[in-house]
Amino acid sequence: MAQAKKKSTAKKKTTSKKRTNSRKKKNDNPIRYVIAILVVVLMVLGVFQLGIIGRLIDSFFNYLFGYSRYLTYILVLLATGFITYSKRIPKTRRTAGSIVLQIALLFVSQLVFHFNSGIKAEREPVLSYVYQSYQHSHFPNFGGGVLGFYLLELSVPLISLFGVCIITILLLCSSVILLTNHQHREVAKVVLENIKAWFGSFNEKMSERNQEKQLKREEKARLKEEQKARQNEQPQIKDVSDFTEVPQERDIPIYGHTENESKSQSQPSRKKRVFDAENSSNNIVNHHQADQQEQLTEQTHNSVESENTIEEAGEVTNVSYVVPPLTLLNQPAKQKATSKAEVQRKGQVLENTLKDFGVNAKVTQIKIGPAVTQYEIQPAQGVKVSKIVNLHNDIALALAAKDVRIEAPIPGRSAVGIEVPNEKISLVSLKEVLDEKFPSNNKLEVGLGRDISGDPITVPLNEMPHLLVAGSTGSGKSVCINGIITSILLNAKPHEVKLMLIDPKMVELNVYNGIPHLLIPVVTNPHKAAQALEKIVAEMERRYDLFQHSSTRNIKGYNELIRKQNQELDEKQPELPYIVVIVDELADLMMVAGKEVENAIQRITQMARAAGIHLIVATQRPSVDVITGIIKNNIPSRIAFAVSSQTDSRTIIGTGGAEKLLGKGDMLYVGNGDSSQTRIQGAFLSDQEVQDVVNYVVEQQQANYVKEMEPDAPVDKSEMKSEDALYDEAYLFVVEQQKASTSLLQRQFRIGYNRASRLMDDLERNQVIGPQKGSKPRQVLIDLNNDEV
């Protein structure tokens, strides 16, 4: 019997082992792992939007759950891992907590979306949305998705929006309790303790503030009492101060009046001498009145004349001179205007485009300009301006435009300006710009073009007071310079405004050679240009000496004093003319004599305004090594034409925007003291119009150049001598090779370093080679075909 029982128990054990092994085999089914891996891979593809499948999965979850889909990804991954490794479904408590947390996040994301935009989710089928979002690669903000949308739409009528917020908070708390496996009492206890601690700290802070306020009140009361006590004692002190100060106040004006009275008799003759001295010194330059110099006193000579003083021509007024008429300029041809219907259609397209991207805005005004049309957009309340700015590429795509420029906001208005290029740029002529403004009382009034509204823009140079013009090649920079010079010729006589033109490119400004407004012929040599700027600095200093001796502050006051004196005296004295210095290409000057040019520009821009000297600098290379920080900071008015990059735009005007210009005269103008840019379509001026104006001016009066203002002539190389016998050979070698260095001379002539460096110094001093510029090779300034060679 016992053996039979043992056998039966052994059989039972073997059968139970077989059952457990079969269960393990069933539980260890590899299909479960394959499914788990597949789910993980799909979730990863959806989270990072990898490939076609990833975008489809993410768009599907985005449609259903919105922003809360990321929690869905996490919950699916956690559930997959738990079921795969524990081989059982998670506990009901944690499952319920996860579901409650998902619902709470649906409410939260939908509420945030509702409060931010107030736009409802679209009710389109899931598959069509998934296909469209994949096709356009665009995932709009859906808040809580379709599930969150319907949850909010069903809950708001039942418990109101405030009730939904309370329910959402309760759901979040419940999910935390369910997931963390804490009792409600423990959670409530912790929350109450935190609230009590917060209230306790708040009460302590309030009590400290009350104590501080009480101390301040007591301090104020004490100070008031001290002030009252001082006021009671003040009458005696006041009497003493009055007694001591009144005689001083009386003495100072009485003493000054006596000095003025004693000098009043000699003052007219002294003033007359000062102005006569300047008049005679001015006439010395023209060699008209050299005999008046003998009447000057030694004191006047010592105060006015100096070793480096440059005497400016005091040109006698040419009564017969007549400024050129505007009829010399061509009449603008009639052009086809932009269709209003087309503009209104684009305005409607613009509104619809913004609406598609969740921006509620209306087009309130449209301004049609010569080159661009500005659509004035007024966004709805709560819409961020940055949201509109970030859509500039989408707006350009919707309007089929080359590029758009967004001015957000328009200065002084609660609106955003969207500038869209016209299909055809309208030509703006200089004549139509000057027609409404000329003749002007301001002799330095120049025409720039028309703004977005089509209004003509003219600016006075003396209010700028200096101008920087920069832009890439072919953007309209040279036409703008010609327009400025022509505007001056059309408005000012030679004795009123003088010009100094510097043109290292040798082809842009040579047409103006011979006009009577020029101080010196057009300067084309970069070395002479640097010297010419130094002459302008010396002229500026001379004028300030005149202002000092005549007790005037600027050129306007000095000329008024001269006019008054001319009415009283028989001898007429010339007034000081304004001087406009125009540099057409700054980059060439900075390469040859960068330090000298930069120093001269710095001094002119800092001090020359009161002296009536104004500087216009133009360059087609707006880089920081050309437009240095010193030059940029001292030239407040700037014009930026089309450039290739935003970096160049920031170099010119301090902000981006010039990289979006259209070229062909399209510019951004920043005036002195302006915080915003004005977009202007520049006035066009043909070469024939310039030539007609120049011929008209030259026929009336020939140029009368000021010799003392001309740069020094280049030193004759044949007369130059060097102590080294190898100098002539080194000179010829450097000119033939068109390169120079100390090591090159050492190898060629087999000499030491010291001798070679001395030869290099001699060559530089004789202006055969340029100065040393770091690691860059020296520039050879003499051409092989030069007659001197």
Swiss-Prot record:
Q: Which residues form the FtsK domain?
A: 454-650
Q: Name one GO cellular component term.
A: plasma membrane
- Which segments does the topology annotation call Cytoplasmic? 179-789
Q: What is its main location?
A: membrane
Residues holding ATP:
474-479
Q: Which compartments is it annotated to reside in? A: Cell membrane
Any one GO molecular-function label of the UniProt entry: ATP hydrolysis activity
Checking InterPro entries in the record gives: AAA+_ATPase, FtsK/SpoIIIE/SftA, FtsK_alpha, FtsK_dom, Ftsk_gamma, P-loop_NTPase, WH-like_DNA-bd_sf, WH_DNA-bd_sf
Give the bilayer topology: Multi-pass membrane protein
- Ranges of Basic and acidic residues composition bias in the record: 209-231, 247-262
Print the keywords alphabetically. ATP-binding, Cell cycle, Cell division, Cell membrane, Chromosome partition, DNA-binding, Membrane, Nucleotide-binding, Transmembrane, Transmembrane helix
Entry's transmembrane regions: 34-54, 63-83, 99-119, 137-157, 158-178
**Per the UniProt entry, what is one GO biological process?**
cell division
Superkingdom of the source species: Bacteria
* Region ranges (Disordered): 1-25, 209-275
Free-text note regarding domains: Consists of an N-terminal domain, which is sufficient for the localization to the septal ring and is required for cell division, followed by a linker domain, and a C-terminal domain, which forms the translocation motor involved in chromosome segregation. The C-terminal domain can be further subdivided into alpha, beta and gamma subdomains. The alpha and beta subdomains form the DNA pump, and the gamma subdomain is a regulatory subdomain.
Its biological function?
Essential cell division protein that coordinates cell division and chromosome segregation. The N-terminus is involved in assembly of the cell-division machinery. The C-terminus functions as a DNA motor that moves dsDNA in an ATP-dependent manner towards the dif recombination site, which is located within the replication terminus region. Required for activation of the Xer recombinase, allowing activation of chromosome unlinking by recombination.
Quaternary form? Answer: Homohexamer. Forms a ring that surrounds DNA.
Which PANTHER family does the record match to this protein?
DNA TRANSLOCASE FTSK, SPORULATION PROTEIN RELATED
Q: Which family does it belong to?
A: Belongs to the FtsK/SpoIIIE/SftA family.
UniProt name for this protein: DNA translocase FtsK
